[in-house]
Amino acid sequence: MIITIGGLAGTGTTTVARILSERMGIPCVSAGDVFRQMAAERELDILEFSRIAEENPEIDIEIDRRQARLADEHEDLILEGRLSAHFARADLKVLLIAPFDVRAQRISVRESKDIETVREEIRIRERSEAQRYREIHGIDVDDLEVYDIVINTNRFDAEAS
């Protein structure tokens, strides 16, 4: 079974994907894993590669291609990433959501940052990503038609999600 898990920062995609992977006994690959692999292939650290990726949409496109290829090459796999559901063949496409303030609080705790700083960073990041996804891929992030299930992670603890 191929499962994609997507969602905005702070919704718990990485946590849920990891737990599901452990419980189902199938591998999990995140878009972040693919990004780190691509950086290593170029012998760059993550920060250097991130700066390059900001100016080069081909990197985002390659991440999506690689996740789609992984889905095609595996019978059982969990793919975690914001756009995984749009590019990978999957049996189940899951979107995790949570209220803005809940997400901000989770990120604030995880990254030991001031909540107001996190709120502003989220707003900037989400505007930027929505624009990039629209320009690069023609994807409207507010269109949820691609997903089979939408789960509000505010309603459950990570183990229950």
From Swiss-Prot:
Entry GO MF terms: ATP binding; CMP kinase activity; dCMP kinase activity
GO BP annotations, alphabetical order: pyrimidine nucleotide metabolic process
EC number: 2.7.4.25
UniProt binding sites for ATP: G7, L8, A9, G10, T11, G12, T13, T14, T15
InterPro entries associated with the record: Cyt_kin_arch (IPR011892), Cytidylate_kinase_dom (IPR011994), P-loop_NTPase (IPR027417)
Keywords: ATP-binding, Cytoplasm, Kinase, Nucleotide-binding, Transferase
Locations listed in the record: Cytoplasm
GO cellular component, one term: cytoplasm
Reactions catalysed according to its record: CMP + ATP = CDP + ADP; dCMP + ATP = dCDP + ADP
Membrane-crossing segments per the record: none
Leading EC class: transferase
Family statement drawn from the similarity comment of this UniProt entry: Belongs to the cytidylate kinase family. Type 2 subfamily.
Listed name of the protein: Cytidylate kinase
Organism listed in the record: Methanothermobacter thermautotrophicus (strain ATCC 29096 / DSM 1053 / JCM 10044 / NBRC 100330 / Delta H)
